[in-house]
Amino acid sequence: MNCAGSPLSSCLTPEEALASGRWVKLICGASNQDLAAIEDLCGIFSLAGVHCIDGAVDAAVVAAIRRGIDWAEARGASRPWLMLSLSDGDDPHFRKAWFDPACCPPACPRPCERVCPALAIGLAATGAPGVLAERCYGCGRCLPACPHGLIEERSQVLAGVDVPLLLAQLRPDAVELHTHPGRGVAFAERVGQLRASGVQLRRLAVSAGLEGTAQSPPALVAELWQRFTLLRAAGFRPLWQLDGRPMSGDLGAGTARAAVKLVAAVLPQAPPGPVQLAGGTNAHTLPQLRSYPLQNLIAGVAFGGVARRLLQPLLLEAQGRGRSLLADAELFPLALGLARELVNPWLERT
């Protein structure tokens, strides 16, 4: 590993980054299966210094993530953890949009195509009508946009019987488990499946928030303590991901407030373990966090939608040239510069 000229935190181990408040995670998307884009994103953000990359429990996705990490490691980057995402039930992160394009009226202005941040809908973006499933990561913005109500969501939750074998085959460093209020039993079942895999996890991240629930912050804290008891009994080390406004970081400054507001309400009573922000995070998150009295207790941040949107124009330009972004000697330095602008403030955080 060559750390010359790099921020201090890009040379820290993931555990050291968590302990020092400089942890940065890249979220590829729990339902994202756009393999070419995933490989490019993981290569660029690994070289930029992220400590962890989170993706779908899918062999092809994991292979793409590892190819990107290998590319960056060959250029002097530290190797980030591979984290895989699961849910203990239905969850917006684990869904795909779907509709029958034959039912779409010819005169429809197709607002679904304009609001899709993944460019997963329509002929112009994908070369085919309908939704390109591998690109869709379940943000849900197309659902209310359709004037005819034709778009539906299809759940992508992994069956419990498949979890142990898949994890044993994929060998992640960590797992993220999305949970919702009242799902303590389902959460415990997932934890049992993780133990049955035999994989020695560095951390088990628990992702939870208030978006789409009627819960109060104290009720969420109580749920987290319940999850903590289960994790401790199972021998897992927790990482708490407070999910402000899921899959919205590309929308602008306002989305960053949700995660900061959530952490301000939950952190003082949170169970032991590092706390990381997610859900609406972007370049505005850290400046907003600096006004928070307990900011030094925050372990770090995860970037998802904003990271993907940031590099999207360059990914498309490389695609138009018939090559990957990592293979384009002109474009990949530009992409690396953009990625570093996003992650360096956290890597250099004091």
Where are these regions (language model features)?
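Conserved, mostly hydrophobic/aromatic
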Residues: 45, 65, 175
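Iron-sulfur cluster-binding cysteine motifs and their immediate structural context
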Residues: 109-131, 141-158
